[in-house]
Structures are given as C-alpha cells and as structure tokens.
Amino acid sequence: MATYNADAIEVLSGLDPVRKRPGMYTDTTRPNHLAQEVIDNSVDEALAGHAKSVQVILHQDNSLEVIDDGRGMPVDIHPEEGVPGVELILTKLHAGGKFSNKNYQFSGGLHGVGISVVNALSTRVEVRVKRDANEYRMTFADGFKDSDLEVIGTVGKRNTGTSVHFWPDPKYFDSAKFSVSRLKHVLKAKAVLCPGLSVVFEDKNTGERVEWHFEDGLRSYLTDAVAELPRLPDEPFCGNLEGSKEAVSWALLWLPEGGESVQESYVNLIPTAQGGTHVNGLRQGLLDAMREFCEFRNLLPRGVKLAPEDVWERIAFVLSMKMQEPQFSGQTKERLSSREAAAFVSGVVKDAFSLWLNEHAEIGLQLAELAISNAGRRLKAGKKVERKKITQGPALPGKLADCAGQEPMRAELFLVEGDSAGGSAKQARDKEFQAIMPLRGKILNTWEVDGGEVLASQEVHDIAVAIGVDPGASDLAQLRYGKICILADADSDGLHIATLLCALFVRHFRPLVEAGHVYVAMPPLYRIDLGKDIYYALDEAERDGILERLAAEKKRGKPQVTRFKGLGEMNPLQLRETTMDPNTRRLVQLTLEDATGTLEIMDMLLAKKRAGDRKSWLESKGNLAEVLV
C-alpha cells in the first residue's frame, strides 16, 4: 500500500483566482458546497478503507466542523515546497494526493481544488490532525496561514484522523447560513453509498443528532424513499460491477401510478444533480435491454419503436459510479462529462437487465406493457411528419439526408459546414432521428436583409424548407425537427459560419430560438493521445487543463496533441462520440435572455452601416479577442 505523506501531494497552481471568481469554484448561494468539499475528503478516506466514521457538527456561530478517523492529513515537510503537507493542501489550489491513483483508487474530493477553496472563502479555518502518536493544530485566516503547525498533545499510535473547522465568509455568499436539510440529505447519501460507514450530524442550534449507517446501501435507501407508493418490481432491480478503472452500482424500480420519484446519481460519492454521461448510460442500457426483450417476444405493436423516454418515464433510481479521473462540466461537479462512463454503464446495465428480465419474465412483461403504453401515448400526442420519401408540399432539398422517425420533437437536424464533413456526419448519425443537411461555404449575412427577400438565397431557402418554417413566421405547427443543431468547425472559419447561422435564426426565425429549438454543437478542437488513453478538448484552456493534469499524474510517455483542422478530419466514429451521440456530446442551446443587449451587439458586429462602431469597438476591446491561428 502506498504511503500517504507530504511527497504524495502534487501541486498544479496557486490559490489567487478563487476570491476573484468564487462562482467558478463553488455554489455561492449558500456555503453548503464548501461543507461538501470537506466531507468528500473524509469520505474518500472511508472509500479507500482507512476511515469508519465521519462526524459533522454545525456550531451556534454558523461554523462547521468535520471530523474523521482516517489516516490524518500529512504533517511532514513537502520535498519541493518546503512546507508541511497540511499547509500545502489548504493554501494551494490543485494540491492533493489524488491526481495519480497511488493513494486513492477512486476519489471525489480532489484534496486540492476543494479544501483550499474552503480556506479561500472562509474568515477562519482550524485544522487538527492526529497522526504518528501526536496531535497537531494549525490555523488560517482569510486563506493565509495564521499560525504554524504545532504539536498540542500526544495520542495512541492507532488514534488517527483529521478535524477541519471553518467559518464561511458571508461576503462571498447570498446567504451565509448552511441549509440543514440539504446537508442532511448529502450526509445520508454518503452513508448509503459507502456501506459500513457511520455518518453523524449534530446541530448545536437545535440539539438535533442524527446517525446514518447502512449495511445494505442502495437497495434499502431506495425502498425507504418510495415506501408508500405502488411500485414495480416490489424489490428494486439492483446490480454492480467493479472493473480495474471504474465501478458502477445501482438500484431502480418504476412507479406505475406516479408519485414523488427519487432520481439520484453520484460519481465517487459526489452528487451529480444535473446527471451526465453515467445517467445517459443507465438510460441507454435499460432501453437496449427492453427493446431486445420486446422484439424477442414479439410484443411491439406495428409501427411502434421504443424511445429512451418510454423506458425512463416514472423510474426511480439511485446510481453510483466510481471512476479514476472523472471529468465534470464546471468546477462544482454537478454534471459528469467523461465519455467513457456512458459506454461502460450502458454495457453493464444492458447485460444485467437483459438477464433480469428473462429471469423475472412475468414482471418483465408488466414493465414492457408500461413502456409500450408510454410509447403509445407519446405517438398519439405528437403529430407525424412526412419524411423525405413522400412527395407533397414543397420539394425537400436534394442534399437533405432525412431521418426515418416521424416524430418531430424527437428529430434533430444538423446543419453541417461543408460537403466532406456532411459525408462523415451522415455516417456518424443515428438514422432513426438525426437528419443531416450540408451547407456549401459561408451563408449570406442576412442581418440587414428584408424578410421577404431572404429566401432569394438558395441556402436560406433550403434551410427554411427543411425545417418547415418560413422566415418571420410565428406559427411553428409545421416544424419538422425538435432540435436544429448548427455544426461547424471549431476554427475561426467555422466560428464565422456558426455566427452567420445564429444571426439568421435570431433575425428571421426568432420564435424558433425563443421556443428553445436552436442549438450549437461543440466539436472538440484538440485530441490528446497518451498511450491508449484519448482525451478531447473543446479549446486551448481545456487542452491546457488536460495536459496539466496528465503532467501532475506523472503518466509515462509524452502526450501527442492533434489539432483538428475541420470536422472532415474526424472519422465517423470520432464525430459520433464527440459531437452527435446524445449520451456523450456537448450541445449549447441558443437563448435570448437579454434580447435588447444581444440584438445591439449583433447589430454592431453584423450591420454594414456600422463599420465605424465596429472599428471603435475593436480599438477599445480588441485586446480581449481570442486569436485563432
């Protein structure tokens, strides 16, 4: 087993950015996220098999104390930085023993971005460490060291652990008070997800003391949560599988008569409130198994094909994924974006659910009936759209590769820059619900073109016919696709084309934008190869972040960085995984929150008559531009 001391702590960068932009590192509505970071570190000790209990105390002065019986933070001097490990962990951003996997196989808190952020956003932090038969104490004020590490007593050799007591700084939060209900919810979830761990919460304001301890984790948690509701099956469908780099466990059931459902997902015991690729994988695995079950038994009525939402409706689940190097959208870790999670979870769940359905055929048939009935309702509610093979109304553009499905709200149209990329996209798409229309070169700048004349442009005419909505029309009844996705290269030309298309939709198809139907796909600009591992980066900042992390992990080999010159350079499999697969892609919805401000900026950028304003803007703001070479 690896020794966990100061030289196991790796440093990536300083603490300065946190106070300037606290919202990038934590949820600033309340200090609950700070509590979660400290709790995560203690729970990581339990995950690694070093701690059996975690105690959380909310004091009357609104400070919070988290105590565990793990190994204790390192107190020896770091070989490169020349300060004790505990000081490094609390004063340097991205300092921790969790970047490589020597000290923790799976970890949620990066002893790093988390606990140093707690220090940066607190007026005072007091850390006590029991380790090597001594008890140590160190204090911090406003993110800086307030007192040196000192020995304050002796303890038994086996008496180890860490206590972190912090006072959140009210100026960084909308409300400086902890939400007790949310705190208790997180703590109960930790106990559920780490069977055998004892978690205690004490509120000194009310005298309340609660202890959670689950030997039968997910199953009993889910059963308790939906105890009063009719459910199918009666006992949750549970499963788990642990690989060398990832592990997944779940408990799920359906609530045929509805009711308040539980839908919770976690990565390395961190709640992912916005789901992510692991939840997408669970949904896909259940769908694949149910489709197979229905087809094998010939249960599907003619013309009915199960969609993900048919199986997902009225589901209650708890999903726990453990993986090395999870990637999240944003620092607050609320959505998992690691692409490999979707494939791992869907494969494991599909195999397990297929087996379970066939072993419990009677319940399987009831669940199939439920899904088929959901599909029937969906088909009845949605109008059908005639696809390209039907010749009536205006002829659809010849270059449109339409999808087969007839439900407009499920269908997606990708407007793809260039014919070569269009070819890759046609191979990468799911023909059932994804249509492709290649665009030749840059479209017309339509910002100042009158609504009646805009259709004179062949490209704009083809887009209007394909989507089924005329420029300027407010009636979206004939809309043929629920999502219209702009897919252009990640380089400067691609951004120009994407801007012109956004301008077209904002100026001439505004009701589409306001109804949330227009999206911009985010293809990666870089691919990073290191051995067998592949990482994709959206831009330079993400590329640098991945390279920094790989350097901190001290992985063998030199990373090979490839810059995609265009979508056509990606093979169909890469394009599908990074840009088109709903389980693993990134799509940004085009919204108009501040319509007046947005229209003013776009007018200044796109109107021919405002060249003078553009020049002034470039002179005053040109230094803020990102130059893409």
Curated annotation (Swiss-Prot):
One Gene Ontology cellular component term attached to this UniProt record is: chromosome
Free-text cofactor note: Binds two Mg(2+) per subunit. The magnesium ions form salt bridges with both the protein and the DNA. Can also accept other divalent metal cations, such as Mn(2+) or Ca(2+).
Q: Which residues does the UniProt site feature Interaction with DNA point to? A: K442, N445, H496, R614
The superkingdom listed in its UniProt entry is Bacteria
Q: Name one GO molecular function term.
A: ATP binding
Q: Which UniProt keywords apply?
A: ATP-binding, DNA-binding, Isomerase, Magnesium, Metal-binding, Nucleotide-binding, Topoisomerase
Binding locations of ATP: Y4, N41, D68, G109, L110, H111, G112, V113, G114, I115, K333
Reported cofactor(s) = Mg(2+); Mn(2+); Ca(2+)
Please list the residues that bind Mg(2+) 2: D489, D491
Q: How does it assemble?
A: Heterotetramer composed of ParC and ParE.
NCBIfam families, alphabetized: parE_Gneg (TIGR01055)
Q: Which HAMAP family did the record assign? A: ParE_type1
Record's function text = Topoisomerase IV is essential for chromosome segregation. It relaxes supercoiled DNA. Performs the decatenation events required during the replication of a circular DNA molecule.
Q: PANTHER family under this entry?
A: DNA GYRASE/TOPOISOMERASE SUBUNIT B, DNA TOPOISOMERASE 4 SUBUNIT B
Protein name stated in the entry:
DNA topoisomerase 4 subunit B
Source species, please?
Pseudomonas aeruginosa (strain ATCC 15692 / DSM 22644 / CIP 104116 / JCM 14847 / LMG 12228 / 1C / PRS 101 / PAO1)
Classification of source organism: Bacteria, Pseudomonadati, Pseudomonadota, Gammaproteobacteria, Pseudomonadales
- The coding gene here is parE
